[in-house]
Amino acid sequence: KPYSADHVTAPVLKEWGPVRTVVSISHRFAGSLVEQDIVFYPNLPRIDFVTRADWRDHHVLLRVYFPARINATKAAYEIQFGNVERETTSNHSWDTAKFEVCAHKWADLSENGLGLSLLNDCKYGHSIKDGEMGLTLIKSGTYPNENADIGFHEFTYSIYPHKGRWQEARTVEMAYDLNSPLVSALAPAKGPGGFWSKVSVDQPCCFVEMMKKAEDGNGYILRIYENRNTRTSMTVNLGFEISHVEEC
C-alpha cells in the first residue's frame, strides 16, 4: 500500500551565496525522520538532495519520484563498465513484476532535444515507467537481519536536466563528479600551481576505471572503458617510465 510523506515542514533558506543556495526541509513518517538539504548551484545544472534519515520503521520501502513528462519508450541505465537500455512500458507480466531494476550511478530518460538524468551516490533500485523516474532510498527489510536498515543513513541523489541525449550531455561525467567530489586543501604558496596525473586519457568518452599493482609485483594493471558505445582512438598518458605494454 503506498503512503505519501505528507508531514513536511516549511522550507527554510539555509544558505544563499555565490557558490550555492541551500533550502532545508524535513519529512516525518511514522517513527522515522528524513531531513534534506536541497542544493542549487549557479554554474552547475544539477540539483542535489543531500539526505539524512533517522529510520525506525520495518517493512516500509522509501522511494522518491520525479515526474519527467518525457516522451521515450526506452531509458538508459548505467551498469559496470557501460550502460543498458530498458523499456519504459509494461507489455508483459514479467515487465509488470519488475517494479524496479538495477543501475549504478545514473539512469536517464531522454527524447530528441532534451532529457533528465537521475544520479545517486549509493542507491541502485531504479524505476522509469510512463514518464516517471523513481529511486529506492531505504528498503527496511527484516530478513536475514531484522534491523538491517534501522538507524542513521546519509546519502545524496540528484536530478540533472539537460539538452540532447545523455551521451552529449555528459551524464556519465556528472555522475562521477557526484560520487568523487572535488577535495580542496590549503598549502603553502610555492609559485604557480601545476597539473600532474599518474595516468590519463585524451578522449572524454573513455574512463580510467582502475589502476592497481600487478599481483606478481611487476608493473601495473589499467582498466579503461569507453562509455558511449562509439568508435574512438585514444592516447594513454602515463606519469612514469614504462618498458612495454600488454593488452589483457
Name each region found by the language model.
Residues 1-248:
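C-terminal (or distal) subdomains of carbohydrate-active enzymes
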